[in-house]
């Protein structure tokens, strides 16, 4: 079996090097390379914002990013023999992270966009399997790199149906980025004005943002166009169960995959969406699963008292807001800490805080804190000393897998907080 590569010039944006990829979905986008089932392919990928959020990017840039260039994907890859009705098996052999990553809160975007309306940015240094940031002293995040956007191109008929249903959603007031030639790659007018944007996940996967899709995962994606036309990008160094703030630890990466082909399986078994499997943990068990925890829950009732029927999204949102309020009261003054960071006040400049009362469940040193549906994981040391600053870890729900060296609540023993189990309807 052969190995193929798509290399990119990382000093250039996709707009400057359009022959390496695309930022729209359309079956007429020509493939960058062709391979056989069983071949390995190495793809170098750009970050989700195509270089806009580098280390020197300001909050003004975060507040008004150019979404026309999101997401720059590497590909497509044409897999010979793949046809509609098949399943393409994509085995993730490796995801090699870059040394820089970032997390941003873009105003008007994210699960709690009305709760956190201001721009925010953290710059992460990535080394030896961990991410650290000067903006969050004492914080280390264990890595579990994966591709946030990975999938196949829809066929012509599905593209037309998808565009129609998304336009209907936009007409009802939903958040949709409709087809637009502005910033599109390729800029062929026959494609750019009709091609689908990359923001939502769809039948052939795409921007699924599933943290378990790192090394060792096997993706099973229904094929809808000849050759499957596989692409990937939007790499994440670490992420929770979702992108609560709209981003994870975003980065560039090098992806290595192996393709397999299951002829006729999608048609035979009625497979219409992405499926995936793993044979081992996506993270070491002590990071991937909690033992002792503190949880908040939510119900499908708005803060104004309006009852919604079977609204799992509202219930999850309420559970997350309840967790943030719990942390604000008993552990972290997140809002004050965010204001301090935005004003340029360093942690050592802040006044000492009184030690709060213990309100969590004590666990042995080395356990971790999990926050809301974003599943932030915080390995905790055992010093038990009271914090000396205000909210070192502001906006934790916006930070994927945030970790602290000592108990952020200042309790005598480390404690740990976790999101509730997924709501089932």
Region locations from a protein language model:
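N-terminal, Lys/Arg-enriched amphipathic/low-complexity engagement segments
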Residues: 2-65
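Short, structured beta-strand/loop micro-motifs enriched in basic residues and often containing a Trp
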Residues: 16-26, 66-74, 196-204
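A generic structural signal for residues embedded in beta-strands
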Residues: 43, 87-90, 221
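Short, Lys/Arg- and Gly-enriched loop/turn segments at beta-strand edges
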Residues: 48-59, 95-105, 227-237, 350-353
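Intrinsically disordered, low-complexity linker/loop segments enriched in Gly/Pro
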Residues: 94-214, 220
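Conserved mixed alpha/beta catalytic, RNA-binding, or beta-rich assembly cores of soluble enzyme
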Residues: 179-310
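Cysteine-centered motifs
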Residues: 409-411, 415
């Amino acid at each position: 079996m052969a190995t193929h590569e798509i290399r990119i010039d990382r000093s250039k944006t996709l707009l400057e090097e359009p022959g390496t990829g695309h930022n729209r979905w359309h079956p007429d986008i020509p493939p960058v390379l062709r391979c056989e089932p069983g071949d390995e392919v190495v793809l170098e990928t750009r970050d989700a914002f195509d270089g806009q959020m580098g280390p020197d990017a300001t909050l003004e840039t975060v507040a008004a990013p150019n979404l026309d260039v999101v997401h720059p994907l590497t590909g497509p890859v044409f897999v010979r023999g793949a046809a509609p009705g098949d399943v393409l098996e994509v085995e993730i052999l490796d995801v090699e992270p870059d040394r820089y990553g970032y997390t941003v809160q873009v105003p008007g975007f994210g699960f709690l966009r009305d709760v956190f309306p201001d721009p925010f940015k953290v710059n992460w240094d990535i080394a030896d399997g961990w991410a650290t940031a000067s903006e969050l002293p004492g914080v280390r995040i264990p890595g579990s790199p994966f591709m946030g956007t990975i999938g196949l191109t829809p066929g012509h008929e599905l593209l037309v149906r998808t565009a129609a249903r998304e336009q209907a959603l936009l007409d009802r007031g939903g958040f949709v980025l409709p087809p637009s030639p502005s910033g599109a790659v390729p800029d062929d007018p026959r494609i750019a004005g009709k091609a689908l944007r990359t923001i939502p996940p769809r039948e052939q996967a795409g921007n699924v943002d599933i943290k378990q899709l790192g090394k060792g995962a096997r993706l099973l994606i229904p094929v809808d166009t000849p050759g499957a036309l596989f692409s990937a990008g939007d790499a994440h160094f670490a992420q929770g169960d979702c992108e609560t703030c709209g981003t994870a630890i975003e980065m560039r990466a090098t992806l290595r995959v192996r393709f397999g082909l299951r002829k006729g399986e999608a048609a035979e078994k009625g497979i219409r969406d992405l499926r995936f499997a793993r044979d081992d943990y996506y993270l070491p068990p002590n990071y991937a699963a909690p033992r002792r925890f503190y949880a908040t829950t939510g119900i499908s009732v708005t803060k104004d008292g309006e009852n919604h029927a079977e609204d799992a999204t509202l219930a999850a949102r309420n559970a997350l807001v309840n967790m943030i309020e719990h942390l604000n009261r008993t552990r972290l003054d997140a809002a004050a800490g965010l204001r301090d960071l935005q004003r340029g006040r360093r942690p050592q400049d802040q006044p000492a805080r009184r030690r709060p009362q213990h309100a969590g469940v004590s666990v042995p040193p080395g356990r971790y804190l999990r926050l809301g549906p974003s599943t932030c994981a915080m390995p905790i040391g055992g010093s038990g000393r009271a914090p000396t600053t205000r909210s070192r870890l502001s906006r934790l729900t916006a930070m994927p897998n945030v970790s602290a060296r000592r108990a952020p609540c200042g309790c005598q023993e480390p404690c740990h907080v976790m999101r509730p189990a997924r709501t089932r309807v």
